[in-house]
Amino acid sequence: MTRHIILDCDPGHDDAIALILALAHPDLVPLAVTTSAGNQTPDKTLNNALRILTLLNRGDIPVAGGATKPLTRELIIADNVHGETGLDGPALPEPSFSPQAITAVELMAQQIRQSTQPVTLVPTGPLTNIALLLASHSELHPKIERIVLMGGAAGVGNWTPAAEFNIFVDPEAADIVFKSGIPITMCGLDVTHQAQIMDEDIERIRAIPNPIAQCVAELLDFFMIYHRDPKWGFIGAPLHDPCTIAWLLKPELFEAQDCWVGIETQSELTLGMTVVDRYQLTGKTANATVLFGLDRLGFVDLLVDSLRVYDPTYLNRR
């Protein structure tokens, strides 16, 4: 069964790899790619999405840029992780096509309205665009099957001691999304920190004789630099955003629990924290399926097998 998806991203190395993973599988039908500010400034994340789709020869997918800043706050970017371009490392082509002359919210609404089946939203950056869509198009809520997002943590954060980056950038947007009543799958740091790519995994990818695999290997080479800092305690580099796509393709790779999740929007110390009620202490109804465990080897195999799809037949088919 095919699933219609809209990818809302802020590329970003792991966003780019999530996009590459998704487009290798015909069961996932990409209706649109929209972008937000986050890993880099909004102009760079939009350009990066266009560059990746150009690399994949997928100029048929409509692309639109979204919000240039959070709902109520100043923008924070993660250029210390992703470099000056947001996709430092490989030599990527310049875009061969242009974005739509409408906003991300307008493109998402258009595609959801026209879709013949419910649509799954896959945001892998701050949730600003998704919040704006939900707030301005309540009539479309019934056509949104699920929101599969990368963000949050039941445990410690990675941008502050309490908060994961995507939620911290726009906690008010996250609050709207988690209160929407739409089914949510939360791929937070608890699971994405288990999705580490090791040096030997990168070499498996580099051994695949196609340009997309080579690009991913070079993305990972750069991504590893930041994550080698001993403070993280990582052996490899965590591939946060591809966990969303992996869950859509192979949910059996993950351990999950339905929980109530609230967003802290006020505290000076814990702003952006995702408060995950794992032990049902609040008595509130669960509003998210939270991922906690991962078969790492199965995850890596899925990525490697998916990259083998990008042979000349695929890349020249359009």
Swiss-Prot record:
One of the record's GO cellular component terms: cytosol
Swiss-Prot/TrEMBL keywords: Glycosidase, Hydrolase
UniProt keyword Ubl conjugation, yes or no: no
Enzyme class: hydrolase
PROSITE patterns the UniProt entry points to: IUNH (PS01247)
Regions annotated as coiled coil: none
EC number: 3.2.-.-
Domain of life, source organism: Bacteria
Record has Hydrolase as a keyword: yes
SS bonds (residue pairs): none
Catalytic residues in the record: H240
BP-aspect Gene Ontology terms: nucleobase-containing small molecule interconversion; purine nucleoside catabolic process; pyrimidine nucleobase metabolic process
InterPro entries linked: I/U_nuclsd_hydro_CS, Inosine/uridine_hydrolase_dom, IUNH, Pyrim_hydro_RihA, Ribo_hydro-like
Family: Belongs to the IUNH family. RihA subfamily.
Described purpose of this protein according to its UniProt entry: Hydrolyzes cytidine or uridine to ribose and cytosine or uracil, respectively.
HAMAP family linked to this entry: Pyrim_hydro_RihA
Protein name per the record: Pyrimidine-specific ribonucleoside hydrolase RihA
Organism of derivation: Shewanella baltica (strain OS155 / ATCC BAA-1091)
